[in-house]
């Protein structure tokens, strides 16, 4: 998941916890740890490939790091280059034809029985945040390769009804250049040519960094990386949930209904800097007090939009209802100047992260919040500047793809567990994924995998071995029933 879109995922998932519990009432006692028993002997479950080898590969990839003592693998770093070679080897082992494009994405493709048909893309990202867990992104890559290898050893790979291409995207987290989806964005064709001019903290531009890695790229060649929409049938991504819902309801897998849209704001409040002991309270123009009031207003607005959101023709009843179940707002950074205990600040800056599945509702919240921020500034005789730093629309997953993924997950879990009385849960994603970028190219579907405690972007991130198995088996079932 993108670090730029990762804050407060817990709260968004929690909004859907009640729904999941109601839709799967007896799930809490199921799948708490699937008993393997005789499953080891089932040839159709491929435990050696889909579990043992897949888990071993995840741990092997988790050791490919630029840092000593923790996992860090950023865009085209030395560790990333080693990961590229490793992933290519695994793809070739699965019978796939491989190549690396000019943005560092690793591709593995099989044409199947009809090379001219629209291709299914399956992927996730191979980069990580700093001090990362080893399942974020990597699970989606490894599970796809494992499923195709199972088909390869079973003689079914060339019988696929359409081409299938696994893509390990080079950069989703945006750690080095502070811009997300460099890998998937190139494939989707949503990166402007000016992307190559973006610099890191050392003032090294992306195009120069690529040249350092023996990749010559121009604005023209960047645009040529875009896939022809007519050549692509759809995109599927398997990813850890990065939240607690699946663990709470006792299901290893869940289908993603959609990905929340996100807006990031930077608010700067300027007042009158002064001595903390000599300026009377009644005479202060304190930007910290103004910022504090604004943050409380934000919390009230986002906790209870039905009570605090003004309608003003910007927000319908249905939009407010949607916001009440999906809206989350976070102030993640705050700084003061000069930041001294005995000085009234002259300036306060803070960030606002707003996410919701309803784009109109999110825009209504931004409109109302901005209006109230300026009103508070006027009341307190301070000045305010609101900057829009990032905006991404919500993505609704394709209903047909989601239905197929749900059937595949159900089939996999039934094979592993036996009779299942409840439906596979459906969840929203509060975090951003490569599927958001690829949605500009084709229809998308996502499958979530349970992770312990909902923890992600942390060394404590963990997925049970049998849940890796379930994810790979569900991917295999999806591929075997591909239309």
Curated annotation (Swiss-Prot):
Localisation per UniProt entry: Endoplasmic reticulum
Signal peptide residues are: 1-30
Q: What is its EC number?
A: 3.5.3.9
Which InterPro entries does this chain map to?
A: Amidase_Cbmase, ArgE/DapE_CS, Bact_exopeptidase_dim_dom, Peptidase_M20, Peptidase_M20_dimer
What does the entry list under GO cellular component? endoplasmic reticulum
| Cofactor descriptive note | Binds 2 manganese ions per subunit.
Any keyword Glycoprotein?
Answer: no
Annotated Mn(2+) 2 binding sites = 136, 173, 457
One BP term from GO: purine nucleobase metabolic process
User: Assembly and partners?
Assistant: Homodimer.
Protein name from the UniProt record: Allantoate deiminase 2
What does the entry state regarding organ or tissue expression? Expressed in stems and leaves, and at low levels in roots. Not detected in nodules.
What cofactor does this chain's UniProt record say it requires?
Mn(2+)
Q: Which Pfam families match?
A: M20_dimer, Peptidase_M20
Q: Per UniProt, where does Mn(2+) 1 bind?
A: 125, 136, 239
Entry-linked CDD domains: M20_bAS
Is Repeat one of the keywords? no
Q: Which reaction does it catalyse?
A: allantoate + H2O + 2 H(+) = (S)-2-ureidoglycine + NH4(+) + CO2
What are the protein's UniProt keywords? Endoplasmic reticulum, Hydrolase, Manganese, Metal-binding, Purine metabolism, Signal
Family assignment from sequence similarity: Belongs to the peptidase M20A family.
Which SUPFAM superfamilies would you find in this protein's record? Bacterial exopeptidase dimerisation domain, Zn-dependent exopeptidases
């Amino acid at each position: 998941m993108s670090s730029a879109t990762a804050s407060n995922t817990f709260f968004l998932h929690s909004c859907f916890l009640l729904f999941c519990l109601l839709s799967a009432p007896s799930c809490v006692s199921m799948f708490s740890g699937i008993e393997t028993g005789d499953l080891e002997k089932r040839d159709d479950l491929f435990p050696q490939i889909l579990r043992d080898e897949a888990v071993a590969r995840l741990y092997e990839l988790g050791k490919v790091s630029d840092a000593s003592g923790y996992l860090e693998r950023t865009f085209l770093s030395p560790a990333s280059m080693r990961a590229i070679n490793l992933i290519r080897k695994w793809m070739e082992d699965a019978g796939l034809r491989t190549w690396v494009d000019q943005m560092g994405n690793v591709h593995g493709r099989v044409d199947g029985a009809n090379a001219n048909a629209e291709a299914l893309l399956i992927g996730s990202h191979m980069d990580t945040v700093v001090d990362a867990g080893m399942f974020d992104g990597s699970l989606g890559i490894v599970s796809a390769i494992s499923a195709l290898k199972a088909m390869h050893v079973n003689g079914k790979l060339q019988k696929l009804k359409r081409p299938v291409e696994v893509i390990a995207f080079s950069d989703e987290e945006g750690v080095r250049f502070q811009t997300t989806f460099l890998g998937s964005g190139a494939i989707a064709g949503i990166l402007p040519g000016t992307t190559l001019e973006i610099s890191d903290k050392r003032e090294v531009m992306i195009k120069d960094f690529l040249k350092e890695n023996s990749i010559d790229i121009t604005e023209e060649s960047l645009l040529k990386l875009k896939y022809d929409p007519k050549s692509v049938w759809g995109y599927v991504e398997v990813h850890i949930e990065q939240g607690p819902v699946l663990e709470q309801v006792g299901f290893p897998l869940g289908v993603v209904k959609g990905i929340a849209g996100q807006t990031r704001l930077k608010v700067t409040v300027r007042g009158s800097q002064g001595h903390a002991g000599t300026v009377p309270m009644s005479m202060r123009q304190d930007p910290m007090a103004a910022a504090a009031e604004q943050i409380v207003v934000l919390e009230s607005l986002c906790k209870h939009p039905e009570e605090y959101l003004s309608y003003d023709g910007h927000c319908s009843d249905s939009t407010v209802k949607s916001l009440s179940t999906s809206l989350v707002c976070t102030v993640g950074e705050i700084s003061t100047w000069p930041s001294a205990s005995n000085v009234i600040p002259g300036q306060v800056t803070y960030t606002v992260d707003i996410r919701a599945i309803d784009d109109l509702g999110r825009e209504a919240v931004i409109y109302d919040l901005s209006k109230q921020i300026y009103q508070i500034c006027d009341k307190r005789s301070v000045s305010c500047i609101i900057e829009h730093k990032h905006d991404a629309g919500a993505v609704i997953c394709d209903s047909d793809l989601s239905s197929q993924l749900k059937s595949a997950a159900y089939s996999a879990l039934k094979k592993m567990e036996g009779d299942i009385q409840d439906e596979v849960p459906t969840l929203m994603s509060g975090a951003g994924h490569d599927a958001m970028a690829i949605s500009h190219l084709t229809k998308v579907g996502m499958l979530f995998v349970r992770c312990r405690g909902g923890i992600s972007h942390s060394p404590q991130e963990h997925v049970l071995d049998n849940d890796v198995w379930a994810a790979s088996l569900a991917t295999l079932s999806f591929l075997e029933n591909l239309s």
